């Protein structure tokens, strides 16, 4: 009955909105212990809301804050209980634990704060840690909850790793130093990335469009003399064409001016003169014929000067054409001479190469003949050596027989002397 009453109390608290922290592990515990655990395993909604508030809102001026309620009571898997806290690290508030007298910081948080703009991702960080022989510590469930309550990791993350501050310094130096990146430029820090992005945006907005990239201008292939000559020809032809067009335009304008000038004079004279003026002019012409003759002479001289100018302009255009043609002819002669010289040099080099090739073939043939002679001489030497050994052997045998014969003669002579 008592257990049923306890279960009824549980259901009532659950209906009221309470939250279970640690459910009872064994159903065979005593009544007193079960009643105590039942009273301590539930929190009211107000108490849970107070315990789940982030301590970032209650940080003091020094940057450190302690966890409230459940955050402050978070413990490690071990004999000692270590509370999570916020420390000031490189000008930022970072979640950390005091483990065996060492500060262990949250690796995902410091990655987001310091290394996100320097490396490609956390997998790159783990690769660097393996290369540096740094082994981060894996968080347990209580540590993950404490870090989640501090806001160091996202709510859905259930895994995390801790790293020593000294090991993070090594990792940061490895990510920013040039010695670990042979043949590559040095990596930039977080501030450099931000400043660089702002400068690039300003340059893109302020810069004007360029005709072509500098890279293409620097990487142009080297041009041969023939290509340079063709470029000169094209430029000269364009220049002569433009000069011809200018000369034609000048001649046409001059002709139009010559045709239009007397018409304008006659029209203006007709419009400005009245009847009385015409009579007076006729009288003046009658009284002074010399002045009219002189005026006519002046007009004739003006027309002659204009015609001379037109002739001089046409002659200057012809002179320009002649000079341009002379330049083109001189360039063609220079190019032909250069081509002839290069062709002669190529033929000389070809003949020299042919001579060297023939001499090389002769040397190779002589070497083959000498090798054949050497082989024959070696064969003769081996034959003579065999004969020499045979003759020497026969000579030794003959000497041995001779000695035996002499010994026999001496023995026979000694026996005869003894008999006598």
UniProtKB/Swiss-Prot annotation:
The protein's matches in Pfam families, at most eight in alphabetical order, are given as: Ski_Sno_DHD
Q: Which UniProt keywords apply?
A: Nucleus
Question: Which superkingdom is the protein from?
Answer: Eukaryota
Output the SUPFAM superfamilies linked to this UniProt entry.
Answer: Putative DNA-binding domain
List the biased-composition ranges (Polar residues).
Answer: 263-273
Where found, per UniProt?
Answer: Nucleus
Region called DACHbox-N, residue ranges: 85-171
The segments labelled Disordered in the record are 23-77, 242-321
**Feature: compositional bias, Basic and acidic residues:** 242-258
Q: Set out the biological process GO terms recorded for this chain's protein.
A: regulation of transcription by RNA polymerase II; thermotaxis
Tissue-by-tissue expression: Expressed in AFD, AWC, ASE and ASK neurons. Expressed in the alae.
Biological function? Transcription factor. Plays a role in the thermotactic response.
- The protein here is known as Dachshund homolog dac-1
Q: Which organism is it from?
A: Caenorhabditis elegans
* Lineage, top ranks: Eukaryota, Metazoa, Ecdysozoa, Nematoda, Chromadorea
User: Quick one: which gene encodes this?
Assistant: dac-1
